[in-house]
């Protein structure tokens, strides 16, 4: 298949509307992220019960993310995205009507949990389309744009819009509005990606061979040591993102006196920053080296900014301006992990779909483990215990990075050597 090289600052123009679809869909999916845990608590459930709902959701998302890369290669990214789209809409309605609508915890868990299967199928399948439609030496910047539009959706619009709608139509009205955004994003993807090409060799495999390829998404973890270490680093990458969304509303709103709208605007500032930092680090990593950016700016930056996200608000109290400082810092450094999405397929060039599935599984496990750590530590060590745990794990990732041996397109096997010619790097 041919690769379209038309780009704008690393954005592949042939996939432009796919990027827009991701932004719109994830806007709807992101509405709940920064207020749902507090809303579930307001319905009469404990903080641990609210966190457990997110933990179950994260587990479902991890399982779905694990298979999404291989499934997207076998049945095409578009079909996989459509399965995720329909699943999201159906179980979101069930979650609102029978779960939250009746404050029924026994129904909140299964409907919200099953809905967790949906967004990874829609979101991560698009990574397969990117990997197969851009040159490998340009994949870091293309994936930077992917995470940028993800941030536009789930973080910026997903946080700012609820901060204005909740005072007028309430939490439930805002959650119903989310359905409109997700439906629009799904329709945009359906229309715009009908002719997006992906290699067809996986689609012609026998059923047995397809299951074998699906299994490879797990076996790579012990057959390729660099994949294993990369997976651990990717899991650690977004612990603060998913964990702070669960624990920080309780600290900011219940303890420090912020309104829900103020907290949502602080959280949106974090995501707004990542729009630019995702693109920035994607481009920088192609010049400086993937692992160098991940290790020194991602791991160290996130360790420090995670601590700041707790200590600065605790010191200054209900001070909106000072609360923005650690939020912006967190947004700058979490994006330094963007090259991880390019590292995985580079480690397994003959099984890119399986490698991407491991990457997606790792992202999903991060979604699962972040609130799980909170569930375990909150009753004993409060918010600070959770923050310190996340910080320690970022330091662990710093020491794991040198163990990942990846040959970056555009570089010789020595990552510190000068880039060789672009022609030699093309896939």
Explain the meaning of each model-derived region:
Residues 1-12, 195-231, 420-427:
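Juxtamembrane intracellular "pre-TM" segments in multi-pass secondary transporters
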Residues 23, 105-121, 320-335:
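Hydrophobic core of transmembrane alpha-helices in multi-pass small-molecule transporters
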Residues 34-48, 246-262:
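Short amphipathic helix-loop junctions that connect adjacent transmembrane helices
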Residues 64-76, 278-290, 378:
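Helix-to-loop junctions at the C-terminal end of transmembrane segments
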Residues 74-85, 287-300:
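Cytoplasmic membrane-interface "Motif A"-like loop-to-helix N-cap segments
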Residues 86-102, 300-316:
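C-terminal ends and interior cores of transmembrane alpha-helices
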Residues 111-149:
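Cytoplasmic helix-loop-helix junction between adjacent transmembrane helices
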Residues 350-380:
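A late C-terminal transmembrane helix in Major Facilitator Superfamily
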């Amino acid at each position: 298949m041919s690769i379209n090289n038309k780009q704008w600052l690393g954005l592949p123009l042939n996939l432009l509307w796919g990027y827009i679809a991701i932004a719109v869909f994830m806007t709807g999916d992101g509405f709940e992220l920064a207020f749902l845990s507090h809303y579930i608590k307001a319905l009469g459930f404990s903080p641990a019960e609210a966190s457990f709902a997110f933990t179950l959701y994260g587990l479902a998302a991890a399982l779905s993310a694990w298979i999404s890369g291989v499934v997207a290669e076998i049945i095409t990214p578009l079909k996989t995205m459509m399965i995720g789209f329909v699943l999201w809409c159906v179980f979101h309605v069930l979650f609102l009507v029978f779960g939250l609508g009746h404050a029924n915890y026994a129904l909140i868990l299964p409907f919200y949990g099953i809905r967790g299967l949906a967004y990874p199928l829609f979101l991560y399948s698009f990574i397969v389309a990117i990997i197969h439609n851009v040159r490998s030496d340009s994949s870091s910047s293309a994936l930077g744009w992917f995470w940028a539009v993800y941030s536009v959706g789930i973080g910026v619009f997903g946080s700012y819009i609820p901060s204005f709608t909740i005072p007028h139509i309430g939490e439930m009205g805002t959650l119903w509005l989310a359905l409109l955004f997700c439906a629009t994003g799904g329709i945009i993807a359906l229309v715009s990606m009908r002719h997006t090409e992906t290699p067809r060799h996986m689609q012609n495999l026998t059923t047995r061979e397809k299951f074998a390829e699906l299994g490879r998404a797990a076996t790579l973890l012990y057959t390729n040591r660099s994949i294993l270490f990369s997976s651990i680093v990717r899991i650690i990458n977004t612990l603060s993102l998913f964990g702070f969304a669960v624990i920080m509303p309780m600290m900011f709103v219940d303890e420090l006196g912020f309104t829900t709208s103020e907290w949502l605007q602080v959280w949106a500032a974090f995501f707004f920053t990542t729009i630019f930092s995702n693109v920035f680090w994607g481009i920088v990593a192609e010049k400086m080296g993937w692992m160098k950016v991940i290790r020194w700016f991602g791991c160290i930056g996130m360790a420090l900014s995670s601590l700041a996200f707790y200590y600065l608000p605790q010191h200054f109290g209900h001070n909106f301006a000072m609360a923005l400082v650690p939020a912006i810092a967190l947004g700058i450094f979490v994006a330094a992990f963007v090259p991880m999405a390019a590292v995985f397929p580079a480690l397994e060039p003959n099984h890119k779909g399986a490698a991407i599935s491991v990457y997606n599984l790792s992202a999903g496990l991060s979604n699962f483990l972040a609130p799980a750590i909170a569930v375990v530590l909150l009753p004993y060590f409060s918010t600070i215990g959770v923050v310190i745990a996340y910080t320690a794990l970022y330091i662990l990732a710093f020491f794991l990075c040198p163990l990942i041996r990846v040959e970056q397109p555009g570089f010789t096997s020595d990552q510190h050597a000068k880039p060789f010619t672009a022609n030699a790097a093309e896939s």
